[in-house]
Amino acid sequence: MKLTALKCPSCGGPIELDEKDENVGYCQYCHTKYYLESEQPKVFIEYKPEAFRNSMATKKESGSKAAAAAGAVIGVIGLLALILVPLSGTSKNSSRYPDRDMTAAAAASGEQSREESKVPVTYSSSFEVLIKEALGMSISSVTEEELGRFKYLAMRKGEAGWLITYSFENPAEAAEQGQDADIHVVVCQEALKVQDIAALQKLEYLNLDHTELPEGSLETLESLKMITCDYIQLDMLRLALGSRAQNLERLNASHLKSLEELSGFPGLKALEMEDCRDIADISALAQVKDLERLKLCDMDEVNDFTVLNVLKKLKSLTIDAENLKDISFINHMPELAHLEITDSRILLLDPLLGKESLKELALVDNSEVRDYAPVGTLAGLETLVLNKYTSQDDPDLTALAGLKHGEFHGMMGIRFLGSLTGLEELKVQGCNVDQPSVIASLPLLKKLVYRKNWGNSDDLSFLAGCQGLTYLDMNHSEFYGDVSYAFNLPALETLILDSSSFEINFDRLQDNPALKALSLNRVKLYKNIEMWSDGMVRSINYDNVLLDENTEFLAHYPSLEYLSLRENQLTDLQFAAGLKNLRELDVADNYVTDTHVLDQLEYLGKGSSVKRPVADVDWIDTAGDFH
C-alpha cells in the first residue's frame, strides 16, 4: 500500500524514484536526494504544511469510501515507522547530528503526531564542501562540538565562484591582541544557505553580502558578537537575529537606508557605517549611547552631527563626510583616544587644543582648514596622519616627542622630523624634502615609506644612515639617483620598488643576508644620469639599463624567500639557481620560456616565514579600524 504523490519536505517539489534503485528518490526542484530505509515496509508519505493538515483534521468525518481509505492509510503510516532522510545522513547518525536527518524517533516509538513531526533540515552542497575541507569529514558524521569550532565565516561572490572564508579564531579579537588569525578560503559554486550558517552555533563573527535573512534564521547563533553586512537592512537583521540582537557588540554595515531600527541593538559597542548615502538623519545614534567606537564613511547627505554630543563613551571616532563643518562634539568625549576626520569642510581645529586623551589622530583631505597649529599641542599623540597639501604653514610638531607612527603628506618641509626622535614608522609622501638627512637622524626608525616627493628627493644617500631599517617602500616613484644604499642596509628584510625608476650602482652592492623579501615589478633602470637647470626648467640625460642583463646582482641576497619581478622583459631565470631559500617567485608577464631551473629550489611553493610584502598605496591606512 503506498501513496505516490510524494513531495520534498524542504521545498515542496515532487520527488521521483530512481529508476535503478527504488529506495532512492530525487526532488525535481532542489535536487535533494532521499532514501527509504530498507528495514521498514516501503510507504511513501505526502508531506503537507502544518496549517493544511490542521484544517483537514477539523473537517467532518463524512465522505466517500475513498476518503475513509485514505484515513486508514495514514493510520498505517503511524505504525510502520517510515524514515525518509537525505542520502548522506542515516538513522545511526541522527544522534550525532539530528537536525540533518528527518528525526523519526517519534515514528519509531509509535508517538509521531502532526504536532511533533519535523520538516528535515537540508544543507547545501557548498556546506558539504566546507565541512569536508575544514573538518575533514562528511556532514553526516560531524558533531555539534566540531561545528562549534567555527568562529568566523564570510561569504562573497568572486570570479571563480563563491568564496567561503572561515576561521577557528575570531580575527577581529586576534588583531586587537596584535596577532593574525589563521584564515582559510574554500571556493564553491553556490552560496551557503541560511540553514547552513545557522548550524554553526558558536560563530562569533559573521560577514554577509546581499543575503536574504528570514525571521529567526540566525537565532541559533548563541555566541555571535560581530556582524559585517552589505545591502542588509537593520530591520531584516534584527528579525533574523531575534533575541540574539540584544547581544550584538559590533556591527559593520554598508548601504543602509535608515537607522530607525538601531534601538534593536542595545548592546552595541562598535558601529561602522560605510557608503550609506541614503541616510540624511543620524539622530538614531542617541539610542546606542554605550558606543565606544563609531565610524561614519561616505555619509555625504548628513548635515547635522549634533547627536554625537551624547556619545560620551566614545573612544574611537572616524568621520568621512563632506558636510561636516565643526568638531566641537569631541569636547563631550573625555575618553576619545582615536580621531580620524576625512574630506570634511571644517575650518577650525581649535577643539583639538590640549586634548590629552588623544593617542591617534588622522586629518586627511580637509582642504578648508585654516590653521593646523592645534595639532602641535597634542603631546600625548603616538600616531599622527597629516594629509595637508596646502600652502599654509606647517604646524610646529616639536612637542610630539612621544610620536611612534607618523604619516606626512604635502608638507612644505621635513626638518621638523628631527625633533620626533621616538618615531618607529614613518611615511613621507608628496613633501618638499628640504633636508633628507634628517630621516637618518631618527634612531628608532624601523619602517619607512618614501614616495613621490620633491625638492632634494633624488638624493638617496641619506639611506646609508638608516642602519636600523627593516622595511623600506619606495614604490610608484621617480628617482634620478642611486638606490644601492637601500640594498646594503644591514637590517633590511623587505624592500619594495614597484613601478619606480632609479639607478642601481651595481658595483656598490654588497652581500646582504638580511634581505628576505624583494619586489621589483615594472621597474625602469638608469645609468649615467646628468641633470642641469636654468632656474626654470630642469633637464635630464641618462642611459637606459635592462634588468634582464643584470640579474646576477640578486646573488648578493641568498636569504631571499619572496621575489617578484613582474613585467620586466625577463628572458632567463638562471639567477634563481642560487636563491636556495626561495618560497615564492613571481615572474609573470615576462618572456621566460625555460623554467627548469626552478626544479632545483626545494622550498619553492612550500610556505614562507615572511609575509608577502604589500606596497603602500595612496589611500591612508590608520590604526583605528576595528574590522
Residue ranges with predicted function:
Residues 3-5, 24:
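Residues immediately within or flanking Cys/His clusters that coordinate Zn2+
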Residues 8-11, 27-30:
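Short cysteine-rich clusters marking metal-coordination/redox-active sites
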Residues 17-26:
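Short linker/helix segments within small regulatory modules
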Residues 34-48:
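Short metal-binding segments enriched for Cys and/or His
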Residues 61-95:
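Alpha-helical transmembrane anchor segments and their immediate juxtamembrane flanks
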Residues 93-136:
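N-terminal, intrinsically disordered, polar/charged segments of Gram-positive cell-envelope systems
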Residues 152-193, 202-217, 223-236, 247-258, ...:
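Concave beta-strand-loop units of leucine-rich repeat
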Residues 197, 218-221, 241-243, 262-265, ...:
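Hydrophobic anchor residues at the C-terminal helix/turn of individual leucine-rich repeat
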